[in-house]
């Protein structure tokens, strides 16, 4: 076994030769580990006379401390060098542009609603809203929809009980408005509506917008002109538009409106008609003095036609790859 002083010199030399933390750890184990040189020195104390052991043990401990201090200093030096090397490798190019925050965008259905609100706002229409949980009167009775009408059936309507339901149309907003203010009235009523249907072109919840004008001398000609202008503005082209006779309990006469698609086929876009005299009477408006027209359209359907979307359900799946197309 080498002399203790020589052992310290040898240990310090090995420590200085260590070029990284892993090599330094091997040196520590060689000298200070369970089977290391200094452990062997301590074990050899039992061969000394009892009165000589304390002094010899103190010398060995001092030598161990010298080696431990040398290890700590070398470790600090190696860690500092490693940090400097890492910092040098990670140097930032301050001339690079920063990461920009990605801007969000309006949902395509929200874009459609905003576009329609803007158009009718310029014509003097105001936006009216109402509750989504309705009662029989506002959703059916006041709109001249009889008790036997199919729309009241469970397979079409979400009922809470015998009198309360999720509204199937925003027409209830028109009833509330006509009862709350005298003519002239000019409103649009956007909002969520609910029907028990789900397929490629229907969802249980969708967005609808209805419009209403009540005033003196309102005719079907006014209705046609308003909707012609709206459709040409919305689709941004001079479309062919046709009005087909139809039936709605709350309007008379009633019509459905089609536009000519790019494939040469007629596409239904909305329903409309002159407000039925019974509806006016139900809200206390004299049909002998006042008349009006109403129209209703599905926001998802118009959005599909405007942007060429084939499946209505895509609007509600929150797929960012789909939604980012409408920024």
UniProtKB/Swiss-Prot annotation:
Transmembrane segments: none
Superkingdom of origin: Bacteria
Keywords: Aminoacyl-tRNA synthetase, ATP-binding, Cytoplasm, Ligase, Magnesium, Metal-binding, Nucleotide-binding, Protein biosynthesis
Cellular location(s): Cytoplasm
InterPro entries hit by this protein: aa-tRNA-synth_II, aa-tRNA-synth_II/BPL/LPL, Phe-tRNA-synth_IIc_asu, Phe-tRNA_ligase_II_N, Phe_tRNA_ligase_alpha1_bac, Phenylalanyl-tRNA_Synthase, tRNA-bd_arm
Gene Ontology terms: biological process: phenylalanyl-tRNA aminoacylation
Cofactor requirement: Mg(2+)
Keyword NADP: no
A molecular function GO annotation: magnesium ion binding
Enzyme class at the top of the EC tree: ligase
One Pfam family hit: Phe_tRNA-synt_N
Catalytic activity: tRNA(Phe) + L-phenylalanine + ATP = L-phenylalanyl-tRNA(Phe) + AMP + diphosphate + H(+)
Record's GO cellular component terms: cytoplasm
Cofactor binding annotation: Binds 2 magnesium ions per tetramer.
E.C. no: 6.1.1.20
Residues that, per the record, bind Mg(2+): 252
Similarity comment: Belongs to the class-II aminoacyl-tRNA synthetase family. Phe-tRNA synthetase alpha subunit type 1 subfamily.
Subunit composition and interactions: Tetramer of two alpha and two beta subunits.
Name recorded for this polypeptide: Phenylalanine--tRNA ligase alpha subunit
Annotated organism of origin: Sodalis glossinidius (strain morsitans)
């Amino acid at each position: 076994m080498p002399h203790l002083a020589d052992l310290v010199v040898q240990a310090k030399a090995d420590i200085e030769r260590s070029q990284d933390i892993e090599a330094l750890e091997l040196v520590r184990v060689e000298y200070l580990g369970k089977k290391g040189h200094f452990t062997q020195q301590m074990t050899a104390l039992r061969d000394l006379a009892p009165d000589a052991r304390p002094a010899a043990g103190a010398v060995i401990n001092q030598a161990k401390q010298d080696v431990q201090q040398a290890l700590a200093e070398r470790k600090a030096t190696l860690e500092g060098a490693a940090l400097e090397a890492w910092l040098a490798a990670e140097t930032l190019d301050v001339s690079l542009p920063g990461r920009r925050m990605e801007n969000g965008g309006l949902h395509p259905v929200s874009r459609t609603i905003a576009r329609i609100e803007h158009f009718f706002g310029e014509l003097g229409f105001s936006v009216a809203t109402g509750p989504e949980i309705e009662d029989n009167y506002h959703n059916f009775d006041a709109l001249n929809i009889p008790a036997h009408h199919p729309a009241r059936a469970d397979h079409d309507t979400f009922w809470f009980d015998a009198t309360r339901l999720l509204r199937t149309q925003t027409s209830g907003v028109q009833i509330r408005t006509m009862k709350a203010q005298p003519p002239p009235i000019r409103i649009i009523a956007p909002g969520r509506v609910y029907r028990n249907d789900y397929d490629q072109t229907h969802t249980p919840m969708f967005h609808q917008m209805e419009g209403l004008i009540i005033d003196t001398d309102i005719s079907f000609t006014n209705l046609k002109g308003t909707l012609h202008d709206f459709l040409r503005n919305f689709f941004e082209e001079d479309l062919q538009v046709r009005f087909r006779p139809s039936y709605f309990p709350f309007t008379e006469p009633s019509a459905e409106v089609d536009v000519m698609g790019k494939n040469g086929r007629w596409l239904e876009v909305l329903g409309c008609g002159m407000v039925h005299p019974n509806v006016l009477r139900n809200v206390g408006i004299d049909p002998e003095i006042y008349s009006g027209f109403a129209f209703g359209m599905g926001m998802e359907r118009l959005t599909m036609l405007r942007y060429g979307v084939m499946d209505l359900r895509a609007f509600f799946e929150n797929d960012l790859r789909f939604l980012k197309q409408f920024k």
